[in-house]
Amino acid sequence: MTQKIEQSQRQERVAAWNRRAECDLAAFQNSPKQTYQAEKARDRKLCANLEEAIRRSGLQDGMTVSFHHAFRGGDLTVNMVMDVIAKMGFKNLTLASSSLSDCHAPLVEHIRQGVVTRIYTSGLRGPLAEEISRGLLAEPVQIHSHGGRVHLVQSGELNIDVAFLGVPSCDEFGNANGYTGKACCGSLGYAIVDADNAKQVVMLTEELLPYPHNPASIEQDQVDLIVKVDRVGDAAKIGAGATRMTTNPRELLIARSAADVIVNSGYFKEGFSMQTGTGGASLAVTRFLEDKMRSRDIRADFALGGITATMVDLHEKGLIRKLLDVQSFDSHAAQSLARNPNHIEISANQYANWGSKGASVDRLDVVVLSALEIDTQFNVNVLTGSDGVLRGASGGHCDTAIASALSIIVAPLVRGRIPTLVDNVLTCITPGSSVDILVTDHGIAVNPARPELAERLQEAGIKVVSIEWLRERARLLTGEPQPIEFTDRVVAVVRYRDGSVIDVVHQVKE
């Protein structure tokens, strides 16, 4: 009885304070410990299957679902999730994957059936890209850079309702990384952004490990639901396609020339930083820098971006002090992330977001990037092929080109009978004002806006030609290609890293 009186007096004291303070704070309501523990069961995040996870996530028609592309061409998560979503009858969804590849061809049918009606992505390849280029999707695809995606998410334009994140392993509370388990993909740099910003986060994992699983790239307080599946991705396919290490003699020639350009650019000095983009020649530049770094006793402070086996090798030899990894480009890089303390995982926000308080690209000295096309104004296309069909990705191209002290584009002058250097690119991803040097197998051109670079290279005995001279050389080799015919219909909108529209892609005329 005394206990009830004391409880009543305490409640009256609280109510009196609320009245005096003119506030509306809720009064404490006592409940049994068992009730709390039933509501907060230790295994409450675990779902028996993907259908249960989707149902519990609260997904509804018209919402936005997101995915990451750490597995690149080996991704199995997008198709698996979208197949179940389609069977459950959902319609009119926005699909926001950090990038899409050849392996995502099954999305074509989901678009035809009205399951997916809008897409945000960095890139498109294969049958999906071909069908969209021919007008499959009613609304234009929104193409963004890696940094630009984070900006769209944080600005509120791209609101992620449910993020489905495939990982090799996690514990029953959601702590996960990408380098523990069979499907070792390395950095989860793109997934971290989704985990930070999505209203609901569903973790798909191949393996459940004891709690607490650490280090955790994605942490327990970011994850709502967990479902164990057989496979989330084929890690063996990460280092294929655009991230392969080349043996092509022409690409190696271009890479060697680019390394010479870097050495004599004025930026090759103790403590410099570097990044190489996707594409055979750009990735190969790193291997040619090793001897030059040794002979001049130069070490890089960091390498950034997509990390490769070659960069790991230089790191372990002491030539690159730290690796800042937003995406691991091969199994060696993924495994290095687990064993090397100075191989550091970073999010796409830390990597390249224009609106970030501290994007690593803003500390970058040298970047080497590839191109499908480049024109005489140094504008670069990495999205559409010479036939006008979508077959590439914006990636971090425009993010790094503008932010780095020195941006180098490496590309063959011609590919077969198709010129790489043209009068005007079909699609502009990176504006020419961001590009400093073009290195081809027929010569090197420097942007006239950077005369000091041309002077340094010439003083070192490197021949520099005008981009107009290279364009004429390409014309002599290939002739004038037939112009591509397009319809008036826009199939893709290209967003610059700040969210502005830099170009549009029209439907190819059949």
Curated annotation (Swiss-Prot):
Q: What subcellular compartments does it reside in?
A: Cytoplasm
The UniProt entry, under Pfam families, shows: CitF (PF04223)
The stated induction of this gene product is:
Repressed by H-NS. Part of the citCDEFXG operon.
* Domain of life the protein comes from: Bacteria
Which GO terms of the molecular function aspect are on file?
citrate (pro-3S)-lyase activity; citrate CoA-transferase activity
UniProt entry tagged with the keyword Transferase: yes
| Catalysis performed (reactions) | citrate = oxaloacetate + acetate; citrate + acetyl-CoA = (3S)-citryl-CoA + acetate
Which GO BP terms sit in this record? acetyl-CoA metabolic process; citrate metabolic process
The record's EC number reads 4.1.3.6, 2.8.3.10
**Which UniProt keywords are listed?**
Cytoplasm, Lyase, Transferase
The UniProt record lists the keyword Oxidoreductase: no
- Where this protein primarily resides, as one coarse class? cytoplasm
The record's Gene Ontology cellular component field reads:
ATP-independent citrate lyase complex; cytoplasm
Function, please?
A: Represents a citrate:acetyl-ACP transferase.
Kindly give the PANTHER family that the UniProt entry links to this protein.
CITRATE LYASE ALPHA CHAIN
Q: Oligomeric state and partners?
A: Oligomer with a subunit composition of (alpha,beta,gamma)6.
This protein is called: Citrate lyase alpha chain
